[in-house]
């Protein structure tokens, strides 16, 4: 195992552990699909590629018919270490989200109809939207936690069009939406007119800039889906916290294992707990399921993959975090001067 770890370290600066190798070997036994291996192993895609490449170079795996398979040497390795195939027992009813959306079936159909001509994801803004079922499940989750009804809700970045589902629910007292992409803000304005929802404010805005006064300390709840760098957590989640009125308010956002190692998770959680002074109340595994975006062949993931095959299912998922403010919690109000680093780091793959 040490030989494999050392070979992986030659290929990436992402931290690698014996558990990393075990996770990838376990996933390979469950599926030869490279996207599914990333999904099941729950390691950052660039790290999975480094591990698979090292295993290939050392003779533990082979590539056949666009699949990753264990060689005889690889089978002997997993038997030696007692590594079996990764099992998946996700609830087939709620898809592991812990909320069911049957009560929102009419809202779901309305949402699908209104968003059928939505703007396609823009690669330059690291956009990728979730499935309609995920968006509606967000409404169900937020409502179940007491964070929607008669609340003022801020949406920071909305390629998922969560604001549209919120309008259809009729639950919030007021909604505000910020997004850097004018295509999205115009689409949301059009949807608001179609729905007849008036208590919404929509702005085209770059979150690297400090929020204007009209957005600070005015809201009960925020939701955002940030790029997965520590700077992006400050820009999106930190800005979200800055919109909240005070203690007892809530924020929602997604973080993946596909582009964030547990080492990065630790740094993100340090920012949340130590810099922002909030508490994490919920982390729901693979809550957010993303529709495969049309620019996959333009991404770093495609350049890295040893097997060039498009994903056949929605492989990209993120954990849903819920945070709550306490006495002394504070957001991030300074200007962020980074450029592309807002979207990219060593663990990124969808940019």
UniProtKB/Swiss-Prot annotation:
GO terms for biological process: polyamine biosynthetic process. Keywords: Cytoplasm, Polyamine biosynthesis, Transferase. It is found in: Cytoplasm. One of its GO terms (molecular function) is transferase activity, transferring alkyl or aryl (other than methyl) groups. It is an enzyme of class 2 (transferase). Its EC number is 2.5.1.128. It catalyses: 2 S-adenosyl 3-(methylsulfanyl)propylamine + spermidine = N(4)-bis(aminopropyl)spermidine + 2 S-methyl-5'-thioadenosine + 2 H(+). Coiled coil: none annotated. Disruption phenotype: Grows at 85 degrees Celsius with a slightly longer lag phase, but is unable to grow at 93 degrees Celsius. InterPro entries: BpsA (IPR014435), BpsA_C (IPR002723), rRNA_MeTrfase/Polyamine_Synth (IPR051720), SAM-dependent_MTases_sf (IPR029063), WH-like_DNA-bd_sf (IPR036388). CDD domains: AdoMet_MTases. Pfam families: BpsA_C. GO terms for cellular component: cytoplasm. SUPFAM superfamilies: S-adenosyl-L-methionine-dependent methyltransferases. Pathway: Amine and polyamine biosynthesis. Belongs to the branched-chain polyamine synthase family. Involved in the biosynthesis of branched-chain polyamines, which support the growth of thermophiles under high-temperature conditions. Catalyzes the sequential condensation of spermidine with the aminopropyl groups of decarboxylated S-adenosylmethionines to produce N(4)-bis(aminopropyl)spermidine via N(4)-aminopropylspermidine. Can also use spermine to produce N(4)-aminopropylspermine. This is N(4)-bis(aminopropyl)spermidine synthase. The lineage of its organism: Archaea, Methanobacteriati, Methanobacteriota, Thermococci, Thermococcales. The gene is bpsA.
């Amino acid at each position: 195992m040490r030989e494999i770890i050392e070979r992986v370290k030659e290929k990436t600066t992402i931290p690698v552990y014996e558990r990393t190798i075990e996770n990838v070997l376990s996933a390979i036994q469950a599926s030869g699909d490279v996207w599914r291996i990333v999904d099941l192993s729950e390691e950052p895609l660039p790290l999975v590629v480094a591990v698979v490449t090292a295993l290939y170079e050392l003779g533990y795996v082979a590539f056949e018919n666009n699949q990753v398979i264990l060689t005889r040497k690889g089978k002997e390795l997993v038997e030696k270490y007692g590594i079996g195939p990764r099992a998946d027992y996700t609830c087939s009813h709620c898809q592991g989200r812990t909320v069911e959306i049957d009560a929102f079936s009419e809202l779901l159909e309305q949402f699908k109809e209104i968003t059928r001509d939505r703007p396609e994801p823009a690669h330059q803004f690291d956009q990728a939207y979730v499935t309609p079922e995920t968006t509606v499940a967000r409404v169900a989750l937020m409502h179940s936690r007491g964070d929607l009804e008669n609340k003022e809700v801020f949406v920071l970045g909305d390629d998922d069009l969560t604001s549209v589902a919120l309008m259809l629910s009729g639950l919030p007292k007021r909604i505000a939406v910020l997004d850097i992409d004018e295509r999205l803000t115009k689409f949301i304005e059009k949807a608001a007119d179609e729905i007849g929802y008036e208590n919404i404010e929509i702005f085209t805005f770059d979150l690297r800039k400090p929020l204007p006064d009209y957005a600070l300390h005015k809201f009960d709840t925020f939701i955002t889906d940030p790029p997965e760098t520590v700077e992006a957590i400050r820009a999106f989640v930190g800005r979200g916290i800055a919109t909240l009125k005070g203690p007892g308010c809530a924020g929602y956002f997604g973080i993946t294992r596909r582009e964030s190692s547990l080492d990065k998770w630790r740094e993100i959680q340090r920012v949340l707990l130590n810099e922002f002074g909030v508490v994490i109340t919920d982390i729901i595994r693979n809550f957010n399921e993303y529709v495969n975006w049309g620019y996959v062949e333009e991404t770093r993931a495609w350049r890295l993959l040893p097997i060039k095959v498009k994903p056949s299912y929605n492989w990209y998922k993120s954990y849903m975090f819920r945070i709550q403010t306490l006495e002394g919690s504070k957001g991030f109000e300074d200007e962020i001067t980074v450029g592309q680093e807002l979207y990219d780091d060593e663990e990124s793959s969808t940019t």
